[in-house]
Amino acid sequence: TGAEGYYNATLDYGDGCTTVTDGKGIHRYYYDPDGNILREEAPDGSTTTYEWDEFHHLLARHSPAGRVEKFEYNAAHGQLSRYTAADGAEWQYRYDERGLLSNITDPAGQTWTQQCDERGLPVSLVSPQGEETRLAYTPQGLLSGIFRQDERRLGIEYDHHNRPETLTDVMGREHHTEYSGHDLPVKMRGPGGQSVRLQW
């Protein structure tokens, strides 16, 4: 990264290989005919390799140290069903009849569950301890509220361009944001009236 915060690099696209030259040296990325990355070589000579199935699902990632991450998918929709970290820890993922994520089980056997509405938006999240977080949305599908134990923890109101305009926190305090014609935030006002102006 340069003094101005920019990343300077030169890219060379070859047949099945892309070479990136930056301040650290030369990085090489090798691909199969379908565009799946097979191998990446770092400037220090270390190599990371990847395995894919015929459906272009990533099956395994081999680190330079020989550690392996594994990925398994369900047959119904080709969605990730199990992730095994290099240390052997496993995460399991299950889906409902619509193919939407319904629960996640971590390596300790704890399960988080999720329910979605008819639009496919998550409306209920339940922790392994049974604590439920509910989510509410606008007719346009934008998040409008987060509730826990029937108490609103966060409220969001949008302007006519669907930009978050007012955030109401758990204490009922409002935080306002104003935007430019290019949809960039230009002024933020806190509950005490203090404001911050942003320039782009």
Tell where the protein language model's regions lie, with residue ranges.
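Extended charged/polar low-complexity repeat regions
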Residues: T1-W200
